[in-house]
Structure formats: C-alpha cells, structure tokens
Amino acid sequence: MAANLWLILGLLASHSSDLAAVREAPPTAVTTPIQNLHIDPAHYTLSWDPAPGADITTGAFCRKGRDIFVWADPGLARCSFQSLSLCHVTNFTVFLGKDRAVAGSIQFPPDDDGDHEAAAQDLRCWVHEGQLSCQWERGPKATGDVHYRMFWRDVRLGPAHNRECPHYHSLDVNTAGPAPHGGHEGCTLDLDTVLGSTPNSPDLVPQVTITVNGSGRAGPVPCMDNTVDLQRAEVLAPPTLTVECNGSEAHARWVARNRFHHGLLGYTLQVNQSSRSEPQEYNVSIPHFWVPNAGAISFRVKSRSEVYPRKLSSWSEAWGLVCPPEVMPVKTALVTSVATVLGAGLVAAGLLLWWRKSLLYRLCPPIPRLRLPLAGEMVVWEPALEDCEVTPVTDA
C-alpha cells in the first residue's frame, strides 16, 4: 500500500515538472520574409527590407486599398504608385509568390484621430471647355465656422507644389477669390491659364491631385483629396460647325473644342436633305464632309471619344443652306451639243453604209471562183514511132 502511494506521488511530481517546463518555454517567434515596411510620400513608393535568410526571389507585388495589383519595381524591394492620398487612411499590402501570400501590410497616412466627419465630403470634379470644376459637400459634423479651401497640383509633384484654386463658389453665392465665410462648396480653375492653351503639348498634365482642406476656430479638420484623370473627367463639348455652298455642292466642316482628346475623337454627322425622306447619319473620322447636288440641306454633328466609346457630346447647333442646282456653262454646253450631233451623224453614216453593202450583197451575190483540179485529169502524150514510108528526094 505504501509503495503504491509513493508511486502515485512520483507520477504527479513528474507531471507537474513537465507543465512548469511548458509554461517557462519561450514563445515561438513569428517570422515574416520582409521587414521595415514604409511609405515614401514624396516619391509615391512602398518599400521594405528582406528579412535575414528570407527567399523572396519568387516575385513580389503590392496593392493599394482595393486598386489593382502592382508589380514590384524590377530588381528592387519596392512598389511605385501613380499617386498617394495624404488624407484617406489607406491599407497597403505586399504579396509574395503565385499563391499571393501576404508578406506584410501598413496603413498610410497614420490616423491622426481627427474628426473625419467634419472634412469635406463627396468631392467630384469634371473638365468642360478648358475649365476644371470641382464640388464638395460640407462634412456632417462640421461646425458653422468651418470653411474650406481647394488646392491642386500635378500628380507627379509633391504637396509642396500645391496651388490654391482662384474662383470659389457655393450653391447660392458666386465669388472670385477666397470667400469670407464657410460657404465654399466648389471651385473652378481655368486650365488654359495655368497649363497653356496648346492641346497635346509635351507639358500637358495628364492627372492632377485635388485637395480640400478645412479649418475652424477649434483648429484644422481632416482633409479630403482625389486624383483626377483629366481625359477621363473631360465632358465632350459639341464641335463648332460651319457650312457653305461650293456651286451645287455643300461643304460642312467643324472644329472640336476638347483639350484632352486631341486626335482621339470620332464624329457622327447628321445630314437632312430635302431630296430624302429621312435624315442620314455618317460616322467619320475627319472634320469635314461634302455632299454633291445638295439642294436644300442641313447639318449637325457631335463628337465621340475613341478612348471611352460611351462618352459622347451633345449635338451641335443645326445649320441649313440651299445650294443652287448644277448649271452647265454655255461653252461647255455648245461643245457637248456639237459632239453629240457629230456622234449621231457618224453612227447614222455607219449604219447607212452597212445597210447598202448588205443590200448589194443580197442583189448581186459574188460568182464563186472556179478551181480546176490538175491532179488525176491530165493526159500524158508520148511520142510514137512513125509508120509511114519516107522516100528520099534527089536532085535531077
């Protein structure tokens, strides 16, 4: 009995020591193939360092928020983006391998615990006839003293290049320059002034970053920003149409009024001609059109984007005109008449000669030539011996 008791106590002591060893064992370190993940807002890059001994030769790619995946720069431990928001907290993730294993993630910019519901909301922008216009709504928790200011810059440049929009407006007040109250709910920027008036120039800015800042007596409120692709945001304007008659022909030509679709437009032309019961539509790629023998006719035209096929302009103003019928000059008419008469005379003479020859042929048919065959009909005469007596004659 005593021996059994000592055996039980020994087993319990051994189990307790094993549990203590388990509790005292250091936790297993979780290792990742990358470390020191960080954002460079000046160059729009997400960089990292490979962990010691990590094999990341299988390829890396990144993702900003819910955007499409971006491959890492060749030979470098970083991904480059076209833009980075300095206002929205965005999650950046690095993936490795074909199975898209998550290697690390980071948020940028760090959340400053500001009241984001006081920031401007629903920022939207569009381009029309050389002007960039943006509108926003006041934050639902913005106090009455909060006012907003809009800045813009080339997306390829950093925040140090921000420039303020000069022409603010609100729902009920239009004013140039900063308004003295918090009524800013939009702003318009003349792109021809700040970018130059030459479309498709080498210095053409393809995208801009729009930032709306807010501030009140309690201090600044979080900002709102957005990257605007100027070509995508451009609202197509109807072309400027002119028409004229060139004799009996009608000539229509037009000029597009879109800055960021230079050379990337097609056109739909509608022609309403009095000689036709229904208007005719033509899809053309060149900015002019000819109609022969036009008569009473009218034109209108609209643009369509070759980049975004669903993007169309409205119809231009319809222009009508009446072109005179085609009139042949007197000299040309005389020459044509003479040529017609001569041609008819030659045809008649030819027919007469043919008729006379045909009649003579029927009245006096030609006598066929006789061909006397020689072979088989000839008689060959051969000399024969004389059978008469010949008496010689002598002189007396």
From Swiss-Prot:
Q: Belongs to which family?
A: Belongs to the type I cytokine receptor family. Type 5 subfamily.
Which one of the record's GO molecular function terms can you name? Answer: interleukin-3 binding
Query: Under what name is this protein listed?
Result: Interleukin-3 receptor subunit alpha
- The species this protein belongs to is Mus musculus
Keywords carried by this UniProt record: Cell membrane, Disulfide bond, Glycoprotein, Isopeptide bond, Membrane, Receptor, Signal, Transmembrane, Transmembrane helix, Ubl conjugation
Placement of sequence motif Box 1 motif = 363-371
- Give the Extracellular membrane side ranges: 17-331
Indicate which residues are glycosylated according to the record: 91, 213, 246, 272, 283
Which cysteines are disulphide-bonded?
62-79, 87-223, 125-134, 165-187, 245-323
For domains, the record's comment is:
The WSXWS motif appears to be necessary for proper protein folding and thereby efficient intracellular transport and cell-surface receptor binding. The box 1 motif is required for JAK interaction and/or activation.
User: How does it get modified after it is made?
Assistant: Ubiquitinated at Lys-357 by RNFT2 in response to IL3. Ubiquitination leads ligand-induced degradation by the proteasome. Ubiquitinated by RNF128 via 'Lys-27'-linked polyubiquitination, facilitating its degradation through the lysosomal pathway.
Alphabetical list of SUPFAM superfamilies matching this protein: Fibronectin type III
Coiled-coil-forming residues are none
Its subunit composition reads: Interacts with IL3. Heterodimer of an alpha and a beta subunit. The beta subunit is common to the IL3, IL5 and GM-CSF receptors.
Q: What does this protein do?
A: Cell surface receptor for IL3 expressed on hematopoietic progenitor cells, monocytes and B-lymphocytes that controls the production and differentiation of hematopoietic progenitor cells into lineage-restricted cells. Ligand stimulation rapidly induces hetrodimerization with IL3RB, phosphorylation and enzyme activity of effector proteins such as JAK2 and PI3K that play a role in signaling cell proliferation and differentiation. Activation of JAK2 leads to STAT5-mediated transcriptional program.
Q: Where is the signal peptide?
A: 1-16
User: Lineage, please?
Assistant: Eukaryota, Metazoa, Chordata, Craniata, Vertebrata
